[in-house]
């Protein structure tokens, strides 16, 4: 928290954060709470305790470290106090939010991101698009 607060007080970072409110388009990745084998092997993943806590709260995915459940509803996390990034309200105020993701491992996260309004345009692969068009439970 202390490091985060120090960074937030930096004029360069403050200026970047102010620019977020002027964005008209955002290109974002849609992440799954369960990290891929590649991310795990590279060490580029959240600590296990954070992943467990997110799973316990029903999180299935994230956009810009804003975690959400299967219905797309925001899932509170103490990561907010330890990370820097665009918050839900600022992100959702951007008129065009383009999500990029694909693969079977991310189907639940992608569906939730669309349902929750985290993105309004999706770039994905054909298999994922077909899966998303199927009624759930079939």
Segments from the language model and where they lie:
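Conserved phosphate- and dinucleotide-binding cores of soluble alpha/beta proteins
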Residues: 1-138
């Amino acid at each position: 928290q202390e490091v985060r607060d120090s960074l937030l007080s930096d004029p360069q970072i403050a200026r970047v954060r102010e620019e977020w409110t002027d964005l008209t388009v955002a290109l974002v990745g849609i992440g799954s709470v369960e990290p891929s084998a590649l991310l795990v092997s590279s060490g580029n993943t959240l600590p296990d305790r954070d992943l467990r806590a997110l799973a316990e709260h029903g999180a299935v995915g994230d956009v810009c470290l804003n975690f959400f459940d299967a219905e797309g509803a925001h899932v509170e996390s103490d990561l907010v106090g330890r990370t820097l990034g665009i918050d839900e309200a600022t992100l959702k105020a951007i008129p065009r939010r383009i999500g990029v993701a694909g693969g079977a491992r991310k189907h639940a996260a992608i569906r939730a991101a669309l349902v929750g309004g985290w993105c309004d345009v999706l770039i994905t692969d054909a298999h994922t698009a077909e899966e998303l068009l199927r009624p759930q439970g079939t």
